[in-house]
């Protein structure tokens, strides 16, 4: 299955990524090869092969719910370049810079 450069640009725009024309061409080629390789799996005869739903025998392994001391805020904020109202200030990632 051929992935077009237009499809790469569309997914990049949805992901808020930008690529040069050469990168777009390279991604289209690479993604096409990956999809072709995955499509080869459809040709494998799996008759009689048990369904594999997980590779691990254990399920729902969780740690004990024990309260632990967190990181000291003063120590944490020593290396923070920008802070505002006791929060770490980071660059906006939304177009209008508003709330999510």
From Swiss-Prot:
Q: Which chemical reaction does it catalyze?
A: L-glutamyl-tRNA(Gln) + L-glutamine + ATP + H2O = L-glutaminyl-tRNA(Gln) + L-glutamate + ADP + phosphate + H(+); L-aspartyl-tRNA(Asn) + L-glutamine + ATP + H2O = L-asparaginyl-tRNA(Asn) + L-glutamate + ADP + phosphate + 2 H(+)
Please give the start and end residues of each transmembrane region. none
Give the top-rank taxon of the lineage listed in the UniProt record for this protein: Bacteria
Identify the InterPro entries for this entry.
Asp/Glu-ADT_sf_sub_c (IPR036113), GatC (IPR003837)
| Main EC class the enzyme belongs to | ligase
One biological-process term from Gene Ontology?
regulation of translational fidelity
Subunit structure, briefly?
Answer: Heterotrimer of A, B and C subunits.
The Swiss-Prot or TrEMBL record describes its family as follows:
Belongs to the GatC family.
| Protein name as it appears in the record | Aspartyl/glutamyl-tRNA(Asn/Gln) amidotransferase subunit C
Native source organism of the sequence:
Streptococcus equi subsp. equi (strain 4047)
Encoded by which gene? gatC
């Amino acid at each position: 299955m051929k992935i077009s450069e237009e499809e790469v640009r569309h997914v990049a725009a949805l992901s808020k990524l930008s690529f040069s024309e050469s990168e777009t061409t390279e991604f289209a080629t690479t993604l096409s090869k990956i999809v072709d390789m995955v499509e080869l799996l459809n040709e494998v005869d799996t008759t009689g092969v048990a369904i594999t739903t997980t590779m691990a025998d254990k399920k729902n392994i969780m740690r004990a719910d024990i309260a632990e001391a967190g990181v000291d805020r003063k120590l944490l904020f020593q290396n923070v370049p920008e802070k505002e109202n006791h929060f770490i200030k980071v660059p906006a990632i939304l177009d209008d810079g508003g709330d999510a």
